Design a protein with these regions (language model features):
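Winged helix-turn-helix DNA-binding recognition segment
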Residues: 63-113, 166-215
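Short recognition helix of helix-turn-helix/winged-helix DNA-binding domains
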Residues: 1-71, 117-178
Length: 215
């Protein structure tokens, strides 16, 4: 903020401890990986709002098959994808065409839909150049934040330090002394927003439990 405070993504361990008392029945370990290098290509081509709609869909990636699924675990139809991202038929047609032309959304041989695994994938990996997106957490955020605010979150994903979860310019740096952390001004420039607007979104994300402010 104006005092130079920094921001970090709240770790899954921290967030789960707080959420466990709310609902013990749901499996909150279902997640997909975001390839931190590759999604920069997506971010460069999509508006912040469309990045937010993509994040909404990430919350519906089946943790076994990688297919987009509805609340019942069945493969999503195109109509269900439209409803999930909250667009009119005409607006969705433009959105879906853009996403398929960019090869972000793919149709499988059996007519199902998935997010291109070059960007978001399931399974296991030894790479440190990934960040986990927990399905339950993403779905919860989708109900609390507007698409543009979700897009703000998505644009931060390539900048989450793999060890500290701080928002920084060099997320794969192993020497703590060399990590260049972002303050609110740096984050504003990163997401293409003026500083006051970025501060308002950061405050909302902090209250939603997505980010923590550090000094």
């Amino acid at each position: 903020d104006r005092n130079g405070n920094l921001y970090k993504v709240v770790s899954e361990r921290q967030s789960e401890a707080a959420k466990r008392a709310l609902n013990r029945k749901k499996d909150r370990r279902h997640f997909s990986f975001a390839n931190m290098r590759n999604i920069r290509e997506v971010i460069a081509k999509l508006s912040t709002t469309d990045c937010g709609r993509l994040l909404v869909l990430i919350g519906h990636i089946d943790f076994k098959s990688g297919i987009l699924v509805n609340e019942r675990g069945n493969a999503m139809t195109k109509k269900q994808i439209q409803k999930t991202v909250g667009l009119s038929e005409r607006a969705f047609r433009d959105f879906f065409r853009k996403m398929t032309e960019m090869d972000v959304i793919q149709e499988t041989a059996d007519g199902k839909y998935r997010i291109n695994p070059d960007y978001h994938f399931v399974g296991s990996t030894d790479s440190v150049e990934v960040v986990k997106a927990f399905s339950s957490a993403v779905r919860k955020l989708s109900g609390r934040l507007r698409p543009a605010e979700l897009g703000f979150v998505y644009k931060l994903l390539p900048h989450v330090h793999y060890d500290t979860t701080m928002i920084c310019a060099d997320p794969f740096e192993t020497d703590p002394c060399k990590i260049r952390f972002y303050n609110v001004k740096g984050i504003a420039e990163l997401v293409g927003m003026d500083e006051d607007a970025a501060r308002r979104v950061l405050n909302k994300l902090r209250k939603a439990g997505v980010l923590a402010e550090t000094r």
